[in-house]
């Protein structure tokens, strides 16, 4: 059986060369809101230059926002994909003052043995939806935090790509089949609050937002997702409905139900979560 993390790593390695930054408009919005929240909260705290762990640094977009605020801050920036780490390193090659340690690792494995009380702030932008074991991983992250430290992150919510899921479901029902989820199953705000409380966080704040994006067609929408490395699916092939037929039928339903003047619409639901 294929390891899902290996497939995810391969997808993001392919997108690191440039296609990710071109297509990641929603992730940029999430990063800007995350940075704004962190800066506002930190300005009221004690640590003006916190020691930071960034999980899922990608090409370094969010890392750059942190450095623009704190030029001499100490950051450990971790990512699963080696090509993403390489791209991020190149982004900061000319910033000699930057105190960044880049680390290629799966956070869910790395976190098991990483030292306690190591960071003032743990941040992550548009990454935690990829966690296979969020409860265990969040528990480890809580252990990393020094007294008074916090975990602040954005992630995608369950209503992300709701049009796509509805279109697929209609096709499955038309063939008398149980719908499968094409994409990730992600946690809701209530589920995240439960996970964080179980890990020992006492102050938890969740903010939800929805962003609508338009694409020329369902095919263009899926190409954009693939260009960002986010084409992983939990669905498996079914006898009697080939992938080609399934997708062609889905395209028809999508265009019929979610057509707009400029193409088709796709919903992104994202969550901004603070835990301290």
From Swiss-Prot:
GO terms for molecular function: carboxyl-O-methyltransferase activity; malonyl-CoA methyltransferase activity. Its EC number is 2.1.1.197. It is an enzyme of class 2 (transferase). One of its GO terms (biological process) is biotin biosynthetic process. Gene3D superfamilies: Vaccinia Virus protein VP39. Pfam families: Methyltransf_23 (PF13489). Keywords: Biotin biosynthesis, Methyltransferase, S-adenosyl-L-methionine, Transferase. Pathway: Cofactor biosynthesis; biotin biosynthesis. InterPro entries: BioC, SAM-dependent_MTases_sf. The keyword Methyltransferase applies. It catalyses: malonyl-[ACP] + S-adenosyl-L-methionine = malonyl-[ACP] methyl ester + S-adenosyl-L-homocysteine. PANTHER family: TRANS-ACONITATE 2-METHYLTRANSFERASE, TRANS-ACONITATE 2-METHYLTRANSFERASE-RELATED. Belongs to the methyltransferase superfamily. Converts the free carboxyl group of a malonyl-thioester to its methyl ester by transfer of a methyl group from S-adenosyl-L-methionine (SAM). It allows to synthesize pimeloyl-ACP via the fatty acid synthetic pathway. This is Malonyl-[acyl-carrier protein] O-methyltransferase. It comes from Paenibacillus sp. (strain JDR-2). The gene is bioC.
């Amino acid at each position: 059986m294929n390891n899902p993390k290996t497939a995810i790593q391969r997808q993001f390695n392919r997108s690191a060369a440039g296609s990710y930054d071109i297509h990641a408009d929603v992730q940029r919005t999430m990063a800007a809101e995350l940075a704004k929240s962190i800066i506002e909260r930190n300005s009221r705290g004690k640590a003006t230059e916190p020691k930071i762990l960034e999980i899922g640094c990608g090409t370094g977009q969010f890392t750059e926002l942190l450095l623009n605020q704190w030029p001499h801050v100490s950051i450990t920036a971790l990512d699963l994909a080696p090509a993403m780490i390489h791209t991020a390193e190149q982004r900061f090659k000319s910033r000699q003052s930057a105190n960044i340690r880049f680390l290629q690792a799966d956070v869910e494995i790395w976190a098991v043995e990483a030292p306690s009380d190591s960071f003032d702030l743990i941040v992550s932008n548009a990454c935690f939806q990829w966690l296979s074991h969020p409860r265990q991983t969040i528990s480890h992250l809580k252990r990393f935090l020094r007294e008074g430290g916090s975990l602040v992150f954005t992630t995608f919510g369950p209503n992300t790509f709701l049009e796509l899921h509805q279109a697929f479901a209609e096709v499955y029902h038309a063939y008398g089949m149980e719908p499968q989820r094409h994409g990730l199953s992600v946690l809701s705000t209530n589920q995240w609050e439960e996970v964080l409380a179980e890990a020992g966080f006492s102050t938890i704040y969740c903010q939800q937002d929805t962003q609508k994006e338009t694409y020329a067609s369902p095919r263009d929408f899926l190409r954009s997702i693939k260009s960002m490395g986010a084409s992983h699916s939990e669905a498996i092939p079914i006898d009697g409905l080939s992938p080609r037929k399934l997708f062609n039928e889905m395209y028809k339903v999508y265009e019929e139900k979610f057509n707009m003047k400029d193409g088709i619409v796709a919903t992104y639901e994202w969550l901004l979560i603070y835990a301290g």
